[in-house]
Amino acid sequence: METNCPNILYLSGITIEECLQSKKTATDTLNTNGDEAEVEKKLPSVFTSVSKWVTHSSFKCWTCHLYFKTVPKFVPTYMRENERGEIEMGVLGNFCSFSCAASYVDLHYTEPKKWEARELLNMLYRFFTSQWISYIKPAISYTLRKEYGGKLSEEAFVSELHTLEESISSKDIFI
């Protein structure tokens, strides 16, 4: 004989309302370029200008594995002039900084593609900052964080990344 026992799961500190709230999926991103926030399923596959680029991402950075509030950066896969006469770049990845994007290139590309990707990344830096540069220092490894057995707290790690990013504009200027 079967009994109709209810399936009950008790989660201390969690309310039913919290369980029933609709949440964005992990593949959603937030684009706040317009008057109202609009949810996109992924980052755009093509970049044409900073003014048309998304301002936020709900994804983690592909290199440091952290959520971030800065404008998402990417590794350009190509650059060309489109049919409207605009510069167009192919988009790969979601990065919190140019340093994290540079680390991705250094880890996943081999010569001569690495050199080409780094040059395109330098060009992307120019689009974002109006500065010509010759080199972007790669980010430090996420494994330096305590949660991966390293010595840096998340705050100290983020501080190191900010220092690297700020050093790009004050050093390594192309003359």
Swiss-Prot record:
Pfam families referenced in this protein's UniProt entry, alphabetically: zf-FCS
Top-level taxon in the UniProt lineage: Viruses
Gene Ontology molecular-function annotations: zinc ion binding
Factors inducing expression: Expressed in the late phase of the viral replicative cycle.
Keywords in alphabetical order: Late protein
Family (UniProt): Belongs to the asfivirus B175L family.
Name of the protein this chain belongs to: Uncharacterized protein B175L
Species of the source: African swine fever virus (isolate Tick/Malawi/Lil 20-1/1983)
